[in-house]
Amino acid sequence: MKISKHKLTTLFTAGIALVMIASFGHAANLSDQDKKFLTSYEKIHVALAADDLASAKAAATELGDSGSDIAKANSLKDARTGFEKLSARAKTTAAGQSGYHVAHCPMLNKDWVQTSTTISNPYGGKGMIGCGEIQK
């Protein structure tokens, strides 16, 4: 059976469209509250990966009571302990959503959610920035 280039292109385009529709459908399942949580969580993640306690605390205030452990933290260690609690919620919230990846650091045995496929370890900070792997 021979398939013309035009039919093959049409099938490929239709397949891509279906994948995109499915991806957008998953993202649409997030409530506004979940989207806000994940946005603030990502800000905290980026700040902790950069060892920036002040920015992590500022982003945590956007989460109200959920972010209070980080907002009140006096050290990066304390902020990272609070972040671990948020990561459990982030994993549940982001499960099955397009654009979110669960990462794991085997050295610290910690998980987190991030939007990039390039590892940015919030638990190890600048000293361990690339330690971890995206979970499949």
Give the residues covered by each predicted segment:
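Intrinsic low-complexity, intrinsically disordered segments enriched in polar/basic residues
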Residues: 1-2, 58
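Intrinsically disordered, low-complexity terminal tails/loops enriched in metal-binding residues
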Residues: 18-136
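Bacterial N-terminal signal peptides that target proteins for export
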Residues: 2-13
